[in-house]
Amino acid sequence: PQVAVATPAPRRFSRRQYSWIGAAAAACAVFMLLPDWQALQADYRSPTAEHRDITLSDGSHMLLDSNSVADVHFDPEQRQVTLLRGQAFFSVKSEPDRAFFVNAGQVRVRVTGTAFAVSVENGEVQVSVESGTVAVKTPTAPEPASLHHGDHLSYSAADNQTRLAQWPNESIAPWRRWQLVAVDQSVEDVIKQLRRYQPGLILLTDKALGQRRITAALNLRDPKRALQAAIAPLGGAVQDGLPYTLIVTDAP
């Protein structure tokens, strides 16, 4: 005998919900149409859902994650990169007489020769070391913190706090393998990260769902399917709304 597989019907939104979704999408669409002056004026930028591998003039490598922006300034005395937005992984060529600096928000990283990741978004900066040593200066300490293999530092401008942790190699810049590793993160925070990889908009309509916690490895090459798989056990659903719009809500 054939087995019938039930599939949940798409959720029907009320007229009020549709009005809210439409207004939010329209506002976001207007914002998206505005010129991205930060990206236009920067030395390097990467488009949505693409990485960009850059060989710098000293032979060092900078890999930009999706929707990331960076400025580069080298002179005879020092090498300096400013990560304005997003995430980057650096493989730095050692030059003992010319230090390599990465600026991200209020954090400054000093390097001689090493491999490490930096991210900056909404006032939060994270630094993770895959090999070698870096010195990280934050506003919370008079002296730089020395980070070695596996060390992870995060600084939040919101509460002016610096936190240290140990990370395994697979947790350092997993976006290089098109993975997002979420460990006890809120649905809202995961959606914020997925927006970097999803063309268009992701709208969260349920505040309670946004506060639920996720631990999962998500495939960044298919953000919609990855998000659906992650929130389905929590009673969430992802639906197509207006063109280039995903609507995240509690399941019917």
Where are these regions (language model features)?
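A residue-level detector for the "anchor" residue at the start of short, highly conserved motifs
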Residues: A4-A23, A29-P252
